[in-house]
């Protein structure tokens, strides 16, 4: 999961997390979210789906070519047992907190996609 995250200890960051059913989420890469705000970024993401899968991602700021986040290929289980298909999602997803307790902290956000492509390799 690629997630924008905020807490009092680490501030705002973009995290790449590995999530195994029944286990806690582990952050495997992170970057300061401030570097992303108001900027176009180019993302190259490669995923091999399967129980013996892998994941890698590079995010580069377009205006100066600075790499903001890079995760080298990681072996990981990229398939849930008994699943019959794959449903990738791109967009803004929010957790409102228990009983909507964080709702007042949310602000309007916008995400724009350009030159979007998906390839089966």
Task: Identify the meaning behind each predicted range.
Residues 20-42:
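Short, aromatic/His-centered strand-loop micro-motif at the edge of beta-sheets
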Residues 1-19, 75-83:
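Glycan-recognition/cleft segments
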């Amino acid at each position: 999961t690629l997630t924008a995250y905020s807490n009092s200890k680490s501030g705002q960051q973009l995290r790449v997390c590995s999530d195994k059913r029944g286990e806690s989420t582990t952050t495997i890469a992170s970057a300061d979210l401030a570097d992303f705000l108001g900027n176009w970024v180019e993302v190259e993401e490669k995923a091999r789906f399967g129980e013996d899968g892998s994941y890698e991602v590079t995010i580069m700021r377009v205006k100066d070519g600075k790499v903001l986040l890079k995760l080298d290929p990681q072996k990981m289980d990229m398939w849930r047992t008994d699943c019959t298909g794959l449903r990738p999602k791109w967009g803004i997803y929010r957790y409102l907190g228990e009983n909507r307790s964080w709702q007042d902290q949310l602000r309007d956000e916008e995400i724009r996609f350009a030159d979007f492509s998906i390839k089966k390799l």
